[in-house]
């Protein structure tokens, strides 16, 4: 399994990258322009994206999806996926770092970003404002310090505990279901501590401001692999109301990207790039058979 070399305590480097941007498309050489126009799906892109020469995509730190390395490079599943999609679309992606799910969603609505790849689940409410291409699934996991394993490595231990999670994320809604299970068992509900990003949730665990950090299963696997002697995690079960959530790349409705983006995903499913990326990052269990557009609202 491929893992990130960064650990939770290094994620604060995000702030210094907020102003980074890619080189303008106007500086591309004629050869590069010709290559872009020859990409299979370039003609399907909206004129605004062709003119910009780039797809601006919001992103926060959420290993293994996105990790800010010491030299400033952003690595992870998301950049690898973007590289494969760019081969089909003919334009690169530019990750613009931000914090907070609400800020990234509203940023798309105000045209600061063309897209956002979460990880964030699609819902009927979100599909009212955004087009969503589902490309993977997740189960919620709860990370704890391994030194507290005797105390916390038990599903019932989470009941009544302090759980840090990103405000508005899948973790928040999944914890509500977990709390229903806790109460059915005669146990106290967990307390949700809403924070801006994944980095903040892990730091809360490290500093004993929270007992657990709620996150995606792939992020929990990556964090434990990066520091196996420091972290453990629980996985929310079906009995505890987990189910499986569909994670999607979001685009504002009306920006013209939905159909070409779906076609790009279909292409990388067909040519094996999707399977390769999911396998390299050890998240085959979260793979889907095919990408879908707006599955929560399509008839």
Sequence positions of predicted segments:
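A ligand-binding cleft/hinge motif common to bilobed small-molecule-binding domains
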Residues: 102, 119-127, 174-178, 207, ...
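Periplasmic-binding protein-like
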Residues: 137-144, 225-266, 283-299
């Amino acid at each position: 399994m491929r893992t990130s070399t960064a650990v939770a305590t290094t994620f604060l480097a995000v702030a210094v990258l907020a102003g980074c941007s890619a080189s303008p498309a106007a500086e591309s050489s004629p050869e590069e322009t010709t290559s872009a126009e020859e990409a299979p799906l370039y003609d399907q892109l909206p004129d605004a994206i062709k003119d910009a020469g780039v797809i601006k995509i919001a992103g926060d730190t959420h290993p293994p999806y996105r990790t800010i390395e010491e030299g400033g490079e952003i690595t992870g599943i998301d950049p690898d996926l973007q590289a494969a999609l760019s081969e089909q679309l003919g334009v690169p992606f530019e990750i613009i770092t931000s914090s907070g799910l609400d800020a990234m969603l509203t940023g798309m609505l105000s045209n600061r970003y063309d897209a956002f790849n979460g990880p964030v689940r699609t819902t009927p409410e979100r599909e009212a404002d955004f087009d969503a291409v589902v490309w993977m699934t997740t189960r919620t996991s709860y990370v704890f310090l391994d030194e507290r394993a005797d105390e916390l490595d038990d599903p019932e231990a989470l009941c009544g505990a302090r759980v840090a999670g990103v405000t508005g994320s899948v973790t928040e809604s999944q914890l509500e279901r977990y709390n229903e299970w806790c109460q059915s068992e005669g146990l106290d509900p967990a307390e949700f501590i809403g924070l801006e990003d994944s980095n903040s949730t892990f730091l809360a665990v490290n500093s004993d401001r929270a007992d657990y950090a709620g996150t995606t299963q792939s992020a929990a696997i990556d964090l434990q692999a990066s520091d196996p002697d420091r972290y453990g995690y629980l996985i929310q079960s079906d009995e505890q109301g987990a189910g499986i959530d569909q994670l999607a790349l979001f685009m504002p409705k009306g920006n013209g990207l939905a159909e070409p983006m779906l076609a790009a995903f279909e292409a990388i499913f067909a040519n094996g790039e999707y399977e390769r990326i999911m396998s390299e990052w050890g998240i085959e269990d979260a793979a889907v058979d095919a990408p879908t557009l707006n599955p929560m609202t399509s008839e």
